[in-house]
UniProtKB/Swiss-Prot annotation:
Keywords: ATP-binding, Nucleotide-binding. The keyword Cell membrane does not apply. ATP binds at residues 78-85. Disulfide bonds: none annotated. This is Uncharacterized protein Mb2031c. GO terms for molecular function: ATP binding. SUPFAM superfamilies: P-loop containing nucleoside triphosphate hydrolases. Gene3D superfamilies: P-loop containing nucleotide triphosphate hydrolases. Coiled coil: none annotated.
Length: 441
């Protein structure tokens, strides 16, 4: 164990398994040797036996562990119930006196004077719900700039532009940002990919006993998010208004954003409609995929493409509660596109992602630069992938090194020297950018 691991108690390999129930960390459980990477079990509860799933999030844990090696302060953000607290307890071992939860009144009192509370501590100091402590980051700057630094800091917070802004401003050069999304196919295994697509990646939704229970949990999540969480993040917009806006955006999933159309539907000004979109984007429940502009002498689209980041939430906003309803819904293809895109985003982070589209409707679902070369991805829910005229335009205009058509099949095969059809299962179980590039050759 090196000096930093000794200092902050990092576990070089996962030693225990998080028990995820309703998004809360209930403890850890050493599995028997025969237990696979994820397994269903039941544990006793005071009033009922609760089904749970043990999920080891190796990729997210490794990413957080690397960040804690590099930076004196790590800010772990993500949507509510994504598993931030669970992950932090799995990766780092903070002593009880070095663990704070700002939602806990006792800990909030301890942190009323952050300098007094933190200056005498050593090792890994974990602070949860940090968005509730506006004076924290200037104090952290003083603490990490001490000649001898006996501590490192893991800061957890729900998605908040103010939180990220304060951290970036006060701790420039001292903080690394890590975003935790929902569960990935690599977390749950390819055999559970369809369930992950239907239910989404929030652990309580994915691990629910049934689709009905999962849908009910997501309904409650949406209500709580709109009525409480947004207000806590500083968004002062009525819950009913934001529900209408979010539902409208669900119907635009996978399409270009039209501020005029959303404003007309909500009977508000375009600037107000844009404010609603930005609020949901800042809360990490909506993705705005920005356009890539190539110097090609053609008019190109400038509006972002809109995706509801968690497909489980998308499906509830659209009234979809099971696989049959999903298969019959006209947003089936767009839903699958968004699911694959979010899985790729988790793999490719922190590389910026773009889409590309001209006024003549030549388009590319995803554009990214890797190792200094441009790559494109087309996400097609078809059994017979082929090269379209639009793809040929993208290859020429964007000078792509490779274009991958991601489809729900079983076989990888080339369609030309620069275009390859790749099964989604192979793409989504890739563990690194290097593995992905090897797959595209």
């Amino acid at each position: 164990m090196d000096e930093i691991e000794s200092l902050i108690g990092l576990r070089p390999t996962p030693l225990t398994w998080p028990v995820v129930i309703a998004g809360d960390f209930l403890g850890v459980w050493d599995p028997p040797p025969s237990l696979p990477g994820a397994a269903n079990h039941e544990i006793s509860a005071p009033t009922a036996r609760i089904s749970c799933m043990l999920i080891e999030r190796r990729d997210a844990a490794a990413r957080l562990r690397r960040a804690l090696h590099r930076a004196p302060v790590v800010l772990l953000t993500g949507p509510r119930q994504a598993g931030k607290t669970t992950l932090s307890r799995l990766v780092g071992k903070s002593a009880p006196e070095c663990t704070f939860d700002a939602e806990n009144p006792v800990d909030a009192t301890r942190l009323a004077d952050p300098m007094l509370a933190l200056s005498g501590l050593s090792g890994l100091i974990t602070i949860d719900e940090a968005q509730r402590i506006p004076d924290l980051f200037p104090v952290l700057r003083v603490l990490v700039d001490r000649p001898v630094m006996p501590a490192r800091f893991l800061i957890l917070g729900s998605a908040s532009p103010d939180l990220v802004g304060l951290a970036s401003e006060s701790l420039a050069g001292r903080v690394e940002l890590v975003e935790l999304s929902g569960l990935t196919v690599r977390d749950v295994g390819s055999s559970a990919a369809d369930r992950l697509w239907l239910r989404g990646g929030l652990p309580p939704s994915f691990t629910a006993r049934s689709n009905e229970d999962s849908a009910a949990w997501r309904d409650g999540y949406i209500t709580t998010f709109l009525e409480r969480d947004l207000a806590q993040l500083g968004v002062r917009i009525p819950a009913a208004t934001m529900r209408r806006a979010w539902t409208m955006l669900a119907h635009y999933h996978g399409q270009l954003f039209s501020g005029a159309e959303l404003a007309r539907s909500l009977d508000v000004a375009q600037t107000t409609a844009r404010r609603y979109l930005d609020a949901l984007t800042d809360a990490l429940v909506v993705r705005q995929l920005t356009p890539w502009f190539a110097n090609i002498g053609k008019r190109q689209r400038r509006s972002p493409k809109i995706y509801i980041r968690d497909t489980g939430l998308l499906h509830r906003l659209l009234g979809i509660d099971d696989r049959l309803a999903l298969e019959r819904n006209p947003k089936l293809g767009a839903s699958w596109e968004g699911f694959v895109l979010e899985q790729l985003a988790a793999l490719l982070a922190p590389n910026p992602l773009y889409y590309w589209r001209t006024q003549q409707d030549a388009e590319l679902d995803l554009y990214v630069e890797l190792s200094g070369r441009p790559y494109g991805f087309e996400i097609k829910r078809t059994s017979t992938p082929s090269i379209s005229r639009s793809m040929r335009s993208a290859l020429v205009d964007l000078q792509l090194a490779r274009l991958a058509i991601v489809y729900p099949g079983e076989h990888r095969f080339p369609l030309s020297d620069t275009v390859v059809a790749v099964p989604a299962d192979q793409i989504l179980t890739t563990g690194s950018v290097d593995e992905l590039l090897a797959l595209l050759k």
